[in-house]
Amino acid sequence: MKVLIIGSGGREHALAWQCAQFDEVVQVFVAPGNAGSALENKISNIQVDSEDIPALIKFVQSESIDITIVGPEAPLVMGIVDEFQDKGLSIFGPSKLASQLEGSKAFCKDFLARNNIPTAFYEVFTETLPAIEYVKKKGLPIVIKADGLAAGKGVIIANTLSEATHAINDMLDGNRFGEAGSRVVIEEFLRGEEASFIVMVDGNNILPMATSQDHKARDNGDKGPNTGGMGAYSPAPVVS
């Protein structure tokens, strides 16, 4: 079996390493991979960008790849799974529509509200003044989120009106996150520990996997700005 892993981070290195442990896997390719995956047995990096879907399809077809596993959110939101499936290629990941739950915070929050799934109160804004007035009305602390993908850095916890105003202006007027910040979701600040419960679904069946806890703050003690993730561990003790 030949496997393609799409992405360049530690997540993709871990996926590639695990796939390479199976006897039935003869070769794992990572597009584009990183310095760590380049050193592993049975693993080869290829110089194809993770968002270059036509080039990825061409590689899969030319190398007779048995299954592709997608790591990053961006190609999923672009519809890589749909395009692979249209070509009859095996790929693991959510469809373009399902990926909007990750790709658009407004889409996700609206989905939760529409289906009566508990979530923090929120509003969506495209203009700065109404957004700032909403913050004044709701009080602090409050959470300002760029609607789209921002490499895990599009969430600001504002403890003062000045911080909230700066974040809103930065996203909506300053174009800090480009198209991803053309809308902002302003959300209630919830206290407590955050954890993820990961399941696989196919539309009919649910397969529970594992719990995980991501740590995004840059500095020790959960301080500093959010990053794409300083580290994570699984299972998460906070989930019983």
Residue ranges and their predicted role:
Residues 1-96:
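ATP-binding N-terminal substructure of ATP-dependent carboxylate-amine bond-forming enzymes
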Residues 158-240:
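Internal nucleotide-binding/catalytic subdomain
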Residues 5, 30-31, 69-70, 91-94, ...:
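General beta-strand structural signal in soluble alpha/beta enzymes
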Residues 39-41, 55-57, 100-106, 219-221:
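Short, charged, surface-exposed secondary-structure boundary motifs
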Residues 45-51, 123-127, 158:
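Short acidic-hydrophobic, aromatic-tinged amphipathic segments that line or gate anion-handling sites
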Residues 92-154:
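A conserved helix-loop-beta module that forms one wall/lid of the active-site cleft
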